[in-house]
Regions:
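Conserved, well-structured functional cores that handle cations and Mg-NTP chemistry
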Residues: 1-152, 157-174, 191
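An anionic, glycine-rich sequence signature occurring as long contiguous blocks
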Residues: 77, 96-120, 124, 128, ...
């Protein structure tokens, strides 16, 4: 059962006060705090927001931290010794905040090395999961917890995953992830690439929106809508 907004805010204030006087006998439960803070965030930001899946890298010097290995980090813009975390954020016109997180464990260097996992404090039952699989676990969990999102967004890593799309379709949840330009879709009964669909959109049907500040200034994107895959059995995709 979800707490009321006032009850959550009162509990949040009590947790904040308790944080000023640490209890040495208390057990840290990151998931419980995530759930409590998540409820507080949604109460403050309001319903009908967007769930956003994305990953970020944490550059490391050593090799002992859980999940660390040489891999591409978007944060660094190159291959680095780093950890990768997959995050779920919630955004509305009132603001944005993180709701959940999962640590990505590279298959061959972590789940396949139980001694290394034990040394880093990784639970023995943890199995390998792709980044989209981590997202597929987080999004339904947030919705089941009562997050009243209207749609889900993410980059191409997540947009190309059929399981994540299937889960969202089953829940009749709108989604606008990035996909590869060569992805095949059905347009008026003809199979074409996503890039070809974009070429059919005239300038007058494109709407430019700013997506925050980038390293080289404001990031502007042109948006348009096209009806694709209309023959899906449930008419929803």
């Amino acid at each position: 059962m979800r707490s009321t907004g006032s009850a959550r805010r009162a509990r949040w204030r009590s947790h904040h006060d308790a944080g000023l006087r640490p209890d040495r006998g208390a057990r840290w439960d990151a998931d419980a705090i995530r759930d409590d803070v998540g409820g507080f965030v949604v109460d403050r930001l309001g319903p009908d927001g967007v769930l956003i899946v994305d990953e970020t890298g944490f550059v490391k010097k050593g090799t002992g931290s859980a999940g660390v290995q040489r891999q591409y980090s978007g944060t660094a813009g190159r291959i680095e010794t780093c950890q990768i975390g997959v995050f779920l954020a919630y955004a509305t016109p009132a603001g944005r905040a993180l709701l959940d997180r999962r640590l990505y464990l590279p298959a061959h260097t972590w789940p396949a090395a139980p001694e290394r996992c034990q040394a880093a404090g990784v639970p023995g039952e943890i199995a390998f999961a792709t980044k989209p699989a981590l997202a597929t676990a987080m999004v339904p969990a947030a919705l089941n917890a009562g997050v009243l999102a209207r749609w889900v967004s993410g980059d191409e890593v997540y947009g190309q995953d059929p399981r994540l799309r299937a889960v969202l379709q089953e829940r009749r949840m709108g989604y606008v992830p990035a996909i590869a330009g060569n992805r095949r879709v059905d347009l008026d009964g003809v199979q074409v690439s996503a890039a070809e669909v974009a070429t059919h959109v005239t300038d007058r049907h494109r709407h430019r929106h700013r997506a925050g500040q980038g390293a080289k200034g404001p990031r502007w994107y042109a948006w348009a809508r096209a009806r694709i895959d209309q023959d899906e059995p449930d008419g929803y995709r």
